Amino acid sequence: MAIIRKTHPLAKIINSAFIDLPAPSNISSWWNMGSLLGLCLIAQIITGLFLAMHYVSDINSAFSSVAHICRDVNYGWLIRNFHANGASLFFICIYLHIARGLYYGSYLYTETWNMGVILLLLTMMTAFVGYVLPWGQMSFWGATVITNLLSAIPYIGDTLVQWIWGGFSVDKPTLTRFFAFHFILPFAIAAASLVHIVFLHETGSNNPVGINSDADQIPFHPYFTFKDLLGFIILLLIIIMLALLSPNLLNDPGNFTPANPLITPPHIKPEWYFLFAYAILRSIPNKLGGVLALLFSILILMLVPLLHTSKIRSATFRPLFKITLWILAADVLILTWIGGQPVEDPYIIIGQAASILYFLIFLVLMPLSGWLENKMLNRD
């Protein structure tokens, strides 16, 4: 008798992707991040759907509707806390996923890597428009400041900003369209994730030693399904603890005040997961230069495969590259800290130094470390 998972047209696809998929036997817990991102995306879509049932995208009612969800809707407070903190965990998993890709040389699967960068941009866009929806002070002013950056684009900038706003300032049309974008983009992310997985399955997964693993592979199920399940349990424990014990730990207190166009907050800042990019944006005094630096701080990831000079793939056997990556990790943490500080000395100069170092690592230190390691390997 034929096994249905191997013969049914739909089951066959699932079987080849999640059950009989040959996977390297030595992939570590760093390879759990992809499945955790899938879990985060599903959780965000489900909680977001329930929130959308009660949310009102009108500037007079948006703030009150969020309060209504938390006070009057059955378990509304829990759904809202899950959704808000789920975004933070989503980005933690994304950054760890990217870090793993950089560390183990997974970026050499260029199509998968570039699709991942597009996914990162889509996710950042979704999170940004979502942050505007509660219509608190930080939502309103964050939307005003970030959308205003587009006015730096020569010739079409001002027209583009007014087109996005739907008027001459951030107002009712802006909120309505941001809600529409926030609803549709996660489905675009889900579709792009499938493309990401298709590209990955063309080449097969990388592994910690960065060599061909064809000779030593095991089926994805049961080995990695159970390994992923452990990751799921840990992630769910973290989000439950966050949502129940400290739901506002990662929120900005400014967003507990309804949006007021007449009062500018003393310090406008985005959510913590955008602070590193925000610090790079602020470190350049020129508006257009800042916008380009902000964009390039993400798009520079697409250059990583092109700037790979080493004969070895994984950082496991690359001491200089390892040091470079840990400097990058420290630099991103410094930028995150600077992004949350006011624009005054000594933060300005620290931010500028950290921003220069960020680009220097990608454009100079990474290729240089590979070149030096090749020299070391070629010694008699």
Curated annotation (Swiss-Prot):
Binding site for heme b b566: 97, 196
Entry annotated with the keyword 4Fe-4S: no
Cystine bridges: none
Residue sites binding heme b b562 per the record: 83, 182
Subunit: The cytochrome bc1 complex contains 3 respiratory subunits (MT-CYB, CYC1 and UQCRFS1), 2 core proteins (UQCRC1 and UQCRC2) and probably 6 low-molecular weight proteins.
Remaining remarks: Heme 1 (or BL or b562) is low-potential and absorbs at about 562 nm, and heme 2 (or BH or b566) is high-potential and absorbs at about 566 nm.
Function, in words: Component of the ubiquinol-cytochrome c reductase complex (complex III or cytochrome b-c1 complex) that is part of the mitochondrial respiratory chain. The b-c1 complex mediates electron transfer from ubiquinol to cytochrome c. Contributes to the generation of a proton gradient across the mitochondrial membrane that is then used for ATP synthesis.
Cofactor: heme b
GO MF, one annotated term: metal ion binding
Membrane protein topology class: Multi-pass membrane protein
Record keywords, A-Z: Electron transport, Heme, Iron, Membrane, Metal-binding, Mitochondrion, Mitochondrion inner membrane, Respiratory chain, Transmembrane, Transmembrane helix, Transport, Ubiquinone
Similarity field: Belongs to the cytochrome b family.
Positions that bind a ubiquinone: 201
Cofactor note: Binds 2 heme b groups non-covalently.
InterPro entries: Cyt_b/b6_C, Cyt_b/b6_C_sf, Cyt_b/b6_N, Cytb/b6-like_sf, Cytochrome_b, Cytochrome_b_C_euk/bac, Cytochrome_b_N_euk/bac, Di-haem_cyt_TM
SUPFAM superfamilies linked: a domain/subunit of cytochrome bc1 complex (Ubiquinol-cytochrome c reductase), Transmembrane di-heme cytochromes
Gene: mt-cyb
GO cellular component, one term: mitochondrial inner membrane
Cellular compartments annotated: Mitochondrion inner membrane
Name this protein carries in UniProt: Cytochrome b
Record-annotated membrane-spanning stretches: 33-53, 77-98, 113-133, 178-198, 226-246, 288-308, 320-340, 347-367
Family matches, as Pfam families: Cytochrom_B_C (PF00032), Cytochrome_B (PF00033)
